[in-house]
Structure formats: C-alpha cells, structure tokens
Amino acid sequence: MKIYIASPISGLTSEEVFSYYDDIERKLRLCGMKPYSPMTAKHYLRGEMTMNPHGYTHPTSTGHAIYKRDKWMLSNSDVVFVNLLNSATISIGCMFELAWADMLGKHIVVVSNGEPPYNHAFIKQAADIIFTSLDDALEYLQELAHCDFVS
C-alpha cells in the first residue's frame, strides 16, 4: 500500500520536520507500506533553522518542483495521511494536498485537535476519518495494513 504523508512544514525547524518524517516513514515501512514524503531528496535542508514555503533555488526545492512532485506522489498513493498537529502556521500546502486527495478519491486519514485554524468544514468534509491523536491514527493505519508497528 502506498501512502502519502502530509504535515505542515513552514515555520518549523528542519530538526522538527525531518525528525517527524523520518519517524513516520520508518513506522510505515515496518508495516510494508511505501511512504511518499514531501521531504524526498531534500536532505540538504537539514541545516535550515526555519523551513520556508518559498525562496529555495535547489532543483528539488523550487516552487514548481515541490508542487509537481508532491502532486505526482499523492496521485500515485492509495492513502493520504494528513497530520495537522503541531503546526506553526496555516499550511497552504497541506490544504492543497487535502483537496487533491479528495478530488482524486483517495482514502484520507486526518489527525487534528479540532481547534482553529483547522476546525473547518472543508477539512471535515474532505477527510474520510479524523483522529485527535497521532497514536490512534497510526493504530488505524497499522490495522489497515494488517500489521503491528515496531518501535
């Protein structure tokens, strides 16, 4: 099963971003899933103090490259996992990813605490399932893949 991982990036430190994506990707791979990550081929950003939504010139991080690659990865996934917890700011990228996933008929699993700014009718209607905790969402994905996560 292929799964696209979406989570707010802008405003977070590179350590926060890479730590999250590395951990989630590892757990999903242990269940035999193939994770698609917006951080693919961006390891050179590990030293960034704060992640920005624009202004990068590296070929894999131009606005066009990010938009097209993330859209391609999402369109080739079976499940889209959107974690809206711990965001530093509203994520326009995540909202695009959620909209693309809905338009493409993907199975959408969202994690949100249900508070503003993500307590919104569009998110609630686009999501197939909304969890309030990351652990509960991962447990569901584990059951969907018929396996147990190994820490």
Task: Give the location of each predicted region.
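Conserved catalytic or regulatory cores that recognize and/or transform ribose-phosphate-containing ligands
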Residues: M1-S151
